[in-house]
């Protein structure tokens, strides 16, 4: 079970948002590469970066901070990045800089042809991030709710050749209210590619619950506010996950 620390980037700083609201952000570090090094030193095997400004702007906005992280830890751990990635040139530029996985969200929903092209050109490096509320997909930094069903869309993207799906329950993200285990398992059971859980991780009980259903196809979990607020000790959680599943 991969426990994947999240580093959300806003104006070059590491922050956390509450339910995706840019006006409700808490700054945890003005030097994101220092935070990245911290999680790697504590045993992280993968990092999850989000260019928050980029997600809203539709193009990269925190590339300098991202490149500093890749330069410092990119040779030690896999790094995945989402937010504002809407064209093949951006994907190629980030992969050349040492990124392992590119996360495509809104662009995958709005422009499936782009996702197909990305999977063809960069097979093995494309993850789709599906953000949902009550089973329906949200786009544009969660500001727009669509009528797309998350399971139906995930199955379509699986056929395109994406590496995995990150499933975020946006009603829980940043709220420390607990992972939506049932919805995550339901999605994983419908697919043959792995699912990474996200949104609402609140403590060790969530880690143990996810480990119990890992064999349903759940590869890991994004660790956000809980590891920054102290509600979850990352090192202890990784150790517990290793004990349960390895």
Curated annotation (Swiss-Prot):
InterPro entries listed in its UniProt record: Aldolase_TIM, His_biosynth, HisA_bact_arch, Isoase_HisA-like, Isoase_HisA-like_bact, RibuloseP-bd_barrel
Organism: Albidiferax ferrireducens (strain ATCC BAA-621 / DSM 15236 / T118)
Family statement: Belongs to the HisA/HisF family.
Listed GO CC annotations: cytoplasm
Molecular function per GO: 1-(5-phosphoribosyl)-5-[(5-phosphoribosylamino)methylideneamino]imidazole-4-carboxamide isomerase activity
Subcellular location: Cytoplasm
Protein name as annotated: 1-(5-phosphoribosyl)-5-[(5-phosphoribosylamino)methylideneamino] imidazole-4-carboxamide isomerase
Pathway of action: Amino-acid biosynthesis; L-histidine biosynthesis; L-histidine from 5-phospho-alpha-D-ribose 1-diphosphate: step 4/9
Keywords: Amino-acid biosynthesis, Cytoplasm, Histidine biosynthesis, Isomerase
